[in-house]
C-alpha cells in the first residue's frame, strides 16, 4: 500500500451554489457568496462624479453593488472629456450626474442607478438626513469644511464614509466610521488551529491508538499523519522536561531531531512534514493578545443596544473563561497531509466534532445573553454564530478617529516623526499641502495655480498658508520643501485620469472590505505620491 497525500477535497463535498453566478465567478473566489450578497444589498452614494469618483464607482458597479446614487450639480464641460471616461462629446452641457450615471448603468444593468443634480456641499448643509438611507458614502473632492460636516452626519446616522481626493500627482483615501468589526479577516498567513500542544480528550484518545514504534509493515509507518506524530512527540518531550515544551533555539532543534529519530526510512514524507510543521508545537497556547484585548473591551459588557458582534464577543469571553479553558472555539479544519485515508478521515471527524461542540456551547451562551438583555434569543442567525466561531482567533476591530478630531487635536508627535523621516516626509508634506490648499481656496476663492498668471504669488501664498497650518498643528519651526510647494501649485487642483483611476481603485477596494466585512481596511490616511511613486499610510 502506497502513502498518499490526503486533502480536504477528497473527503468534503464542495458547496453547491443555489444560483450560478458566472458573471461574478472570479470575485466569488475571493469573498464568497456571503460577501457577494452583502455587496448586492449595499446602497452606495457618490458625491462628485469627476474622474476620481467615476473610477471608484465603476469598480463597484462591475462588482455588482446593489444600488448607486450619484450626486453632482455641475454640467459636463469640454475639459471633462480628457479625464473622465464616463462622459462623451454628446454629454457636453448636460448634467454630469445624469451622464455618468447612464454610462455606469451600461456597465451592469443589474445595478439600480440613480442621480441627483445638486451640489454636494449644499446637500450636506441643507439636507443632512439624506445620507441616512445609504450603506456607505464615497465623498470625492470635498474641501475641509464639507468633510468635517459630512463626517459628523455619517457618524450620527451610523453610515460608513470613505473620503477620496485626487489632486494633480497626489491623492488620499481616508475611511471614517465609529467602529468596524471584522469576523472573516482573511489574514495572509495564520497558524492552523491544530492544538498540537494542548490536545482535547478525543484527540488524545485517537493519538494513543497509534503506535509510532511499530515499523512493520513499513507502509503503515508512512501513513501516520503528522498531527499524530507531533502530539505524541510533544507529550514525550513534556514528560522529560518537567511539563515544558521547547522554547530555546537549541531545544527546538533537539525536538526536531527527536522527531527525525523516529523515522524508519528516508522516504517517509509524513515525518518530513512533521519536522517542517514542528514550529506549530512551539506556538503559545490560548488566545492572542489582540483577541484578549477584544474580550476585555468595555463594549463586551453588553446591553440592549449592543450589536450582534459584541453579543458574540461576550459569549466568547464566557467560553474562554469556562469551557474553552483559555482557548477559543476550535476552527475544525485540518490541512492536507500525507496519511492513509482512514486516518485522515478519522482525524477530520475528530476536529469537526470538537468544532461543532464548541459552536453549540457558544450558540447557547449567545441565546442566554440575548435573553438577559431583553432581545430575541434567535435574533442572531446560526450561520453568523458559526462563522464567528470558525474565525474567533482572527477577529479584528477597527476604530477610526473623527476627521474633526484629527484636524483639531492633531497628534503632534506623529506628525513630527513623519516629517523627520526621509521615507515618509513626502507623504506628510502632501497631507499638509492638501489641507493648506483648502485653506488657500477658502481665503482666495481659488486653488493655488488654478488659473494662468500669478503663479509666483500663489507659491508665496501657499507657503505662508502651509507654515500657518504647521504652527496650528503644533509643529513650530517645521518647514516643507520649496520643490513640493512649487509642484502643488503646478498641479492647479487638476484631476489627472491616471492618478484618479489609481486612487479611485484604492477607494473601491476599501469600500468592498467595509461592505463585505472581510479583509482588514486601512487604518489611517492613505497618501499617494505620484512624484516619488509611493503609496503610504499615515496613522494620525
From Swiss-Prot:
Q: What Gene3D superfamilies does its record include?
A: NAD(P)-binding Rossmann-like Domain
Function field? Regulatory subunit of the dimeric ECR1-AXR1 E1 enzyme. E1 activates RUB1/NEDD8 by first adenylating its C-terminal glycine residue with ATP, thereafter linking this residue to the side chain of the catalytic cysteine, yielding a RUB1-ECR1 thioester and free AMP. E1 finally transfers RUB1 to the catalytic cysteine of RCE1. Plays an important role in auxin response. Regulates the chromosomal localization of meiotic recombination by crossovers (COs) and subsequent synapsis, probably through the activation of a CRL4 complex.
Task: Enumerate the UniProt keywords alphabetically.
Answer: Auxin signaling pathway, Nucleotide-binding, Nucleus, Ubl conjugation pathway
Pfam families (alphabetical): ThiF (PF00899)
UniProt-annotated location(s)? Nucleus
Q: Which organism is it from?
A: Arabidopsis thaliana
**Null phenotype?**
Impaired meiotic recombination characterized by a shortage in bivalent formation due to a mislocalization of class I crossovers (COs) and correlated with strong synapsis defects. Dwarf plants, highly branched, with small crinkled leaves, small flowers and short fruits, symptoms of fertility defects.
A single Gene Ontology CC term: nucleus
Annotated SUPFAM superfamilies = Activating enzymes of the ubiquitin-like proteins
Oligomeric state and interaction partners are given as: Heterodimer of ECR1 and AXR1. The complex binds to RUB1/NEDD8 and RCE1.
Family to which this protein belongs: Belongs to the ubiquitin-activating E1 family. ULA1 subfamily.
The domain of life is: Eukaryota
What tissue expression does the UniProt record report for this protein? Answer: Expressed in shoot, root and floral meristems, in vascular tissues of cotyledons and mature leaves, and in the stele of the root. Expressed at higher levels on the lower side of an emerging root during germination and at higher levels on the underside of the apical hook.
Q: Name one GO biological process term.
A: response to water deprivation
* Name of this chain's protein: NEDD8-activating enzyme E1 regulatory subunit AXR1
Listed pathway(s)? Protein modification; protein neddylation
List the GO molecular function terms.
NEDD8 activating enzyme activity; nucleotide binding
